């Protein structure tokens, strides 16, 4: 979780050729985003991916120390996805959920190229009411008019 499993030199030697090829094929096919899924602290990995033409990463786990505000300053064109601490859903504390979302979502949305999402999948400890609070606030912060959860079917 603390960083890369291989050195940047070995990444360039062993991984970069494949990432370059995949990103190139994606661009040639008109796909605007070449994304990678990687766990742990990915701060050192991002510059290497950018060298390869990869322009997106997810889920940006919180606990290992990723900082999307720092990454946004350094890589303004890179697509960022995630970075909302999944543990806030497990705890179900409305003020913790509000704090997590309001501290991150507005600033990152304003910077562009950000998809707000959890820093991993929803865990079994998350309750339905907690998830509804999270989604309602997320919709409020993103200006989505579909707004409130749970939704009930019309009629």
Task: Give each language-model segment a name.
Residues 1-155:
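Active-site loop segments of alpha/beta catalytic cores
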């Amino acid at each position: 979780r603390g960083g890369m499993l291989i050195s940047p030199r070995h990444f360039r030697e062993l991984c970069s050729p494949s990432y370059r090829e995949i990103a190139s094929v994606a661009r040639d096919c008109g796909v605007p985003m070449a994304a990678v899924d990687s766990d742990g602290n990915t701060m050192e990995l991002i510059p290497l991916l950018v060298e390869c033409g990869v322009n997106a990463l997810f889920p940006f786990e919180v606990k290992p120390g990723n900082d999307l505000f720092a990454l946004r300053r350094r890589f303004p064109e890179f697509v960022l996805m995630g970075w909302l601490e999944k543990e806030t859903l497990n705890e179900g504390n409305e003020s913790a959920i509000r704090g997590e979302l309001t501290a991150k979502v507005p600033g990152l949305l304003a910077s562009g190229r950000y998809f707000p999402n959890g820093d991993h999948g929803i865990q079994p400890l998350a309750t339905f009411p907690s998830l509804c609070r999270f989604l309602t606030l997320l919709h409020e912060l993103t200006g989505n008019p579909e707004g409130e959860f749970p939704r009930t079917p019309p009629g």
